[in-house]
Amino acid sequence: MARYTGPVCKLCRREGIKLFLKGDRCYTDKCAIARRNYAPGQHGHTRKKPTEYALQLREKQKAKRIYGVLEAQFRRYFEMAERQPGITGENLLVILERRLDNVVYRLGLAESRAQARQLVRHNFFTVNGRKVNIPSYLVKVGDVIALKEEKKDSPIAKEIMERAASKTLPAWLSYDANNAVGKVEALPKREDIDIPVEEHLIVELYSR
């Protein structure tokens, strides 16, 4: 299955909730779901009571779209979460939060996860001093994520450094604005993860 390349605002309208896929635009009146709060397509205005399966599927689709993950990889993350001690749904969200593209976004070094994914692929960052250009790389406690020195003079780097300096960080990350360096201080807890997903429904879906 190929990665979705169509209008991302349609994805928010499909889920009936803001997924914050376009960065700052999602916080303005230009957000599509603020203007057209119904599903896209000919039958978008039709409201039917969803089945239990439909509710479970929608939660999975929301999580996949928020983090930009395709089905095969999402399934692997779920299997990883199942093998770990604790609550499977929470384990799954923690794994998704540990993706390098998500951490770059959480640090404020990208406007959206999609932009973070692109910047990682274009070698803008190092992890513990080593080049990492794999968006799905899973960070660990103690990992240091830094903007490459040779990239700091580029217009986009200056823009993201300015944005990151005023970003409110989750409790599990720290950021040195003077050097554009972030650190994973701890693994996130469920209360640190502010995404509109009911993860227990995803667990129920994969347990069918």
From Swiss-Prot:
Q: Which residues form the S4 RNA-binding domain?
A: 98-161
User: Which keywords label this protein?
Assistant: Ribonucleoprotein, Ribosomal protein, RNA-binding, rRNA-binding
- Protein family per UniProt: Belongs to the universal ribosomal protein uS4 family.
**Gene Ontology molecular function terms on file:** rRNA binding; structural constituent of ribosome
What InterPro entries has UniProt attached to this entry? Ribosomal_uS4, Ribosomal_uS4_bac-type, Ribosomal_uS4_CS, Ribosomal_uS4_N, S4_RNA-bd, S4_RNA-bd_sf
Task: Note whether RNA-binding occurs among the keywords.
Answer: yes
Which Gene Ontology terms of cellular component type are present?
Answer: small ribosomal subunit
Instruction: State what this protein does.
Output: One of the primary rRNA binding proteins, it binds directly to 16S rRNA where it nucleates assembly of the body of the 30S subunit. With S5 and S12 plays an important role in translational accuracy.
Whether Magnesium counts among this entry's keywords is no
Q: Which domain of life is it from?
A: Bacteria
**PANTHER family linked to this entry:** 30S 40S RIBOSOMAL PROTEIN, SMALL RIBOSOMAL SUBUNIT PROTEIN US4M
Please give one Pfam family short name: S4
Record's Gene3D superfamilies? Answer: Ribosomal Protein S4 Delta 41, Chain A, domain 1, RNA-binding S4 domain
The entry describes its oligomerization and partners as: Part of the 30S ribosomal subunit. Contacts protein S5. The interaction surface between S4 and S5 is involved in control of translational fidelity.
**What protein am I looking at?**
Small ribosomal subunit protein uS4
**What's the source species for this entry?**
Carboxydothermus hydrogenoformans (strain ATCC BAA-161 / DSM 6008 / Z-2901)
Per the UniProt entry, what is one GO biological process? translation
